[in-house]
A protein has these predicted regions:
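Pepsin-like aspartyl protease folds
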Residues: 1, 35, 40-61, 87-88, ...
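Signature of the N-terminal lobe/flap region of pepsin-like aspartyl proteases
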Residues: 1-83, 211, 236
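Active-site beta-strand/loop microenvironment that shapes enzyme catalytic pockets
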Residues: 5-7, 180-208
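A residue-level signal for conserved active-site and pocket-lining positions in enzyme catalytic cores
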Residues: 67, 100, 144, 194, ...
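Aspartyl protease catalytic domain
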Residues: 68, 75-184, 260-266
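Aspartic protease catalytic domain
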Residues: 84-85, 234-301
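Conserved beta-strand elements of beta-rich interaction domains across eukaryotes
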Residues: 86, 104-106, 137, 147-149, ...
Length: 301
């Protein structure tokens, strides 16, 4: 089983599962499908079930198989083969599953949790780390075992990681909206390439959209909207004592009409922590270092 090396939409800091030929035929349409027959071995009695905050989910069975990503191989990786997925996953033909790069404590396989891909291969790497360089409107890449200095500018700002919950979780100590002054406030955050938007505390989101002409919270759309023509300020998170900035144009996420757009920054209500998803990460070179553990951010070149 060999996914493309630069399959940014399929690699996530969260869980690992794939579309498989064990799903209903209607759900397989338009997707790359995992067939365990050539080399996979069924782990009898092992199942998994994942539900996400947006109501989507998937469930299935488990195989042991050889998995290679970007030249790195796990010889007996637990592959969570979907037997059923929610309609939102079935209709998204840009997504054929998720590759887990988090800590194995987050794994949902029963009766015994399985190692994530990264935990399976990290002992074979020169350094037990990987980096993510996601791009806006262009293919991104992941590197395993080394840091490519040609992909970022300036220094890498590191913050300690709390891995107790299985996430790459760290503390941001403040933020900056546009060219304004830094606001010191600590909040717990995770970096997750499997999440599209940024989800932040209410006070920070309100502070940001107060600087966007015509912005308002819409109960109809369940988030902040604004005139598409509005100038969008940048947003910087203070991480490891340094500001790491996402351009305002990235936060103008998607049109919902010919004149109105939906914001890439929304409330983290009910989540319990901040999530820096792709809207933020596509401006950053991110180092996930399991040796300490720690996470590092630098501005992309």
């Amino acid at each position: 089983m060999v996914p493309p090396a630069h399959e940014s939409d399929a690699l996530t800091i969260g869980f690992r599962w794939v579309f498989s030929n064990k799903m209903p035929v209607a759900q397989q349409s338009g997707h790359a499908i995992y067939d365990p027959a050539p080399s996979g071995t069924l782990k009898s009695g092992y199942t998994w079930n994942i539900r996400y905050g947006d109501g989507s989910g998937a469930s299935g069975v488990v195989y042991a198989d050889k998995v290679t990503i970007g030249g790195v191989t796990a010889t007996s990786q637990a592959v969570e083969a979907a037997t059923s997925v929610s309609s939102s996953f079935a209709s998204d033909q840009n997504n054929d599953g998720l590759v887990g790069l988090s800590f194995s404590t987050i794994n949902t396989v029963s009766p015994v949790k399985q190692l994530t891909f990264f935990d399976s291969i990290k002992s074979t790497l020169v350094s037990p780390l990987f980096t993510a360089t996601l791009r806006k409107g262009a293919p991104g890449s992941y590197d395993f075992g080394y840091i490519d200095a040609t992909k970022y500018t300036g220094s890498i700002a590191y913050a300690p990681v709390n891995s107790a919950n299985g996430f790459w979780q760290f503390t941001s100590t403040g933020y900056v909206v546009g060219s304004g002054a830094a606001v010191g406030t600590s909040y717990s955050a995770i970096a997750d390439t499997g999440t599209t938007l940024m989800y932040l505390p209410t006070s920070i989101v309100q502070a940001y959209y107060s600087k966007v002409a015509g912005a308002q919270y819409s109960s109809t759309y369940g988030g902040w909207i604004f005139p598409c023509a509005s100038a969008m300020p940048s947003f910087s998170a203070i991480i490891g004592g340094q500001a790491r900035t996402v351009p305002g144009s990235y936060i103008n996420w998607a049109p919902i009409s010919s004149t109105t757009c939906f914001g890439g920054m929304q409330y983290n209500t009910g989540i319990g922590f901040t999530i820096f998803g792709d809207v933020f990460l596509k401006s950053q070179f991110v180092v996930f270092d399991s040796s300490v553990p720690r996470i590092g951010f630098a501005q992309q070149k």
